[in-house]
Amino acid sequence: MAGHSKWANIKHRKAAQDAKRGKLFTKFIRELTVSAREGGSDPDSNPRLRIAIDKALGGNMTRDTIERAIKRGAGELEGQQLETIIYEGYGPGGTAVMVETMTDNRNRTVSGVRNAFSKSGGNLGTDGSVAYLFTKRGVLSYAPGTDEDALMDAALEAGAEDVVSYDDGAIDVFTEPTAFYEVKDALDAAGFVSDNAEIAMIASTKAELDAETAEKFMRLIDTLEEHDDVQEVYHNAEISDEIMESLG
């Protein structure tokens, strides 16, 4: 979003909605379970699991609950079998949207995702239809007031790819996925604690939306995120701070 950290408005809005709907713990447990199943139960050798653990702890999930989810994923406890499926589509204003889901029922999930796109005036695409517009990168976000020069020096020395500052003082540090925790640990040790840290799909091009289109687009995002099987939604929409504020 213009002059503002790409993640700030929609991420904060999303987190508030997730908490309000009581969905955060469900999402944490699913991510912990699938991460452990696909990459093993040791977070030191499974970066995806380590990120999931950090997010769960940040959301006040108990270590006991986290451990049970990991054991379930590793096959030490019984539980539902989930698989990760990525859906791609086009939203209002020609926006590119990627929807990461975890499900035990493909038919239920694809039906819900397709319906969300259709209701917003968009359409669900085929595999690869928008994926080429996104690159997987690590993102570390820092609040306004952070010493930009010191953070940039520390980040680049630690192996970050890029450091982007915004008009309001917010800063994003971008990394290769494989270097994410090396950079994060170095910055943590240097006293730079991020507001948000994740490996995400970053769009290479943006679609700027006017107020009317932005309202339709956010309705699509809300509908997708209300679906129990949806874990993350990535997109290339560019929405100004003023429009985001008007949307609430």
Curated annotation (Swiss-Prot):
Cytoplasm in keyword set: yes
Gene3D superfamilies per the UniProt record, alphabetical: 1.10.10.200, 3.30.70.980
GO cellular component: cytosol
Protein's GO biological process: regulation of DNA-templated transcription
Compartments, record wording: Cytoplasm
Main location: cytoplasm
Signal peptide boundaries: none
Keywords annotated in UniProt: Cytoplasm, DNA-binding, Transcription, Transcription regulation
Residue stretches in coiled coil: none
GO molecular function annotation: DNA binding
HAMAP family: Transcrip_reg_TACO1
Record-stated family: Belongs to the TACO1 family.
Protein name: Probable transcriptional regulatory protein SO_2432
Lineage of source species: Bacteria, Pseudomonadati, Pseudomonadota, Gammaproteobacteria, Alteromonadales
